[in-house]
Design a protein with these regions (language model features):
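Carbohydrate transferase catalytic cores enriched for Leloir-type hexosyltransferases
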Residues: 1-346
Length: 346
């Protein structure tokens, strides 16, 4: 079988969540199916940079255009909720989230372009892979996709590679500095945490960042808040290892990869009870209403003062994270390809 994949977001060292997913899929599929052929397709703005990436022996490189895709591929897989406007034998698209369509978390222009691409991909895909049950339901309800065409494949998480260090009184948040991540309420809650704790924010600037940064600058606890910007994976693993608590009160997530990463590192997690986060966290996190600042404050204050509960959440988090593997995600994705190649009905 020959599989073509939109590999655009797998290029470079500064990978987003979609980039991590893309790289895990590309590497895993090529490694576990050596007798099959793969076309790693890159859009023009990343094509030249892709030559810095070493491809597996059974993979070739292809310049992907809006109207150009490998014609000989049995299946084309769009790894980030869009497809090229080219003739495709069979198409699979992964949908990560639809928050752009369901909340005020982006500019009108970005929302318009996203909606156009997402609806086009949904209408032309033979199968849709949703990264969570929550996202699957949104694809069905918001985009009107027949449930029979949707398959759920959860992300995996790699064991942490950080240096073993002593945990410090750090509350860590990983994610872009944007409205959707609910950082303003996290800062409000942190104001009431004991003064020997720090809040560390790891993530690049996103929609609404200027207002959030201004709020941090005006906070009483501003001297105890660190903003790191984008943090490379190796360095981020060390922050996960150092943090005594991980806080993730996001308002909307299609999956919530940082929750799993924190759990895999042994950090106890306080997280939102909204969207896909409870599906990922299970009973291994302290879940709170992200719009209730008092509830978030209570959880933070209580957990900073309760080492026994931190230890219990750490243990449960490690067990939970072990259930999510990239090997399983790769195999389930391959089964979707086989469904189409074998001509199995919806």
């Amino acid at each position: 079988m020959k599989i073509a994949l939109d590999s655009t977001y797998s290029v470079g060292a500064d990978l987003s969540g979609v980039g991590v997913y893309s790289r895990e899929m590309l590497d895993g599929l090529a490694r576990t199916h050596p007798a099959d052929r793969f076309a790693f397709c890159y859009r023009p703005h990343r094509f030249l940079r892709s030559f810095g990436e070493r491809l597996p022996a059974n993979a070739g490189r292809f310049l992907l255009g809006e109207t150009r895709a490998p014609r000989s591929a049995d299946v084309f897989h769009g790894l980030n909720q869009r497809l090229p406007h080219a003739r495709l034998r069979r198409a699979v698209t992964t949908f990560h989230d639809l928050f752009v369509l369901t909340g005020e978390y982006s500019t009108p222009e970005f929302r318009r372009r996203f909606a156009e691409q997402a609806r086009d991909a949904a209408s032309r895909s033979d199968r849709i892979i949703a990264v969570s049950q929550f996202t699957a339901r949104q694809v069905i309800d918001v985009l009107g996709v027949d449930q029979a065409r949707v398959r759920v494949v959860h992300h995996g998480v790699r064991p942490p590679g950080g240096t073993a260090v002593t945990r410090q009184k750090i509350i860590l948040h990983v994610g872009a500095i944007q409205y959707r991540k609910n950082i303003s309420r996290l800062v409000d809650a942190f104001e009431r945490v004991d003064r020997d704790w720090q809040l560390v924010l790891a993530g690049s600037a996103g929609y609404g960042a200027a207002e959030i940064v201004a709020k941090i600058g005006a906070a009483r606890s501003r001297e105890r808040i660190r903003m790191l910007g984008y943090v490379p994976p190796a360095e981020l693993a060390n922050w996960y290892a150092r943090a005594m608590i991980f806080a993730f009160p996001s308002l909307d997530e299609g999956f919530g990869m940082p929750v799993l990463e924190a759990m895999a590192s042994g950090a106890p997690v306080i997280a939102s009870d909204r969207s896909a986060v409870p599906e990922v966290a299970g009973d291994a996190a302290w879940l709170v209403d992200p719009e209730d600042t008092e509830e978030l404050t209570g959880a933070l204050v209580a957990l900073t003062r309760d080492p026994e509960r931190r230890a219990d959440l750490s243990r449960r988090g490690l067990e939970r994270a072990a259930r999510f593997t990239w090997a399983e995600a790769v195999e389930k994705t391959w089964q979707v390809y086989r469904e189409l190649a074998d001509g199995r009905p919806d």
